[in-house]
């Protein structure tokens, strides 16, 4: 399935041919640790087990932690 992903950290947008169906599949395909990002669809944060749909438009936001 085709989805569009905007990477906030790099300020880039890419069309991705996703081989799986979930957010977790997407993060694995992109080799991104799920603990370091938030995935947003339609201005809502979605979980790793959320099922994605054809032509979804997602944002991947970096999580910043500090002490």
Regions found by a protein language model. Name each.
Residues 1-65:
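Ubiquitin-like/PB1-type beta-grasp interaction modules and other compact soluble beta-rich domains
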């Amino acid at each position: 399935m085709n989805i569009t992903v905007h990477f906030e950290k790099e300020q880039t947008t890419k069309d991705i041919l996703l081989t799986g169906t979930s957010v977790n599949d997407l993060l694995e395909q992109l080799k991104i640790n799920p603990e370091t990002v938030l995935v947003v669809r339609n201005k809502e944060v979605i979980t790793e087990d959320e099922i994605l749909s054809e032509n979804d438009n997602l944002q991947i936001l970096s999580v910043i932690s500090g002490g």
